[in-house]
Amino acid sequence: GCLVTGQALAQASSTAAKQHIVIQVSTPETRIWSQALNYVENLQSLYGKDNVEIEIVALGWGIGMLKFDSPLATRVADTLKRGAGLSACEVTMSRQKLQKQDMLPDIGYVPAGLGQIIKRQRDGWSYISG
């Protein structure tokens, strides 16, 4: 027969449960953005791509890396292809006089970045600061 301990069952069920993670990036620093994109890859490897939902929310000065001329445009596109969400704060876009045509294709938009992060946390998502 097969003996499974309560601890093993708890670990298996917690691994099987879909993880939901929101990552805030509010800095224009390339190294911080690279780190946030690495988080996505690492978390997808850890949990399995289909077992984790990840959204990076860019606000404040961090929104620049989602512009069409971003030095990380290729990495952002790769992250989107892997199924992670990248959302730009429309409040920040308005303040910085950015339009959707200034931004990378296929990203998402949220009315307020902080509001989105608060909503995700209220819905049980884990929070990571990029």
Predicted regions located by residue number:
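Secreted/extracellular ectodomain signature
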Residues: 4, 8-130
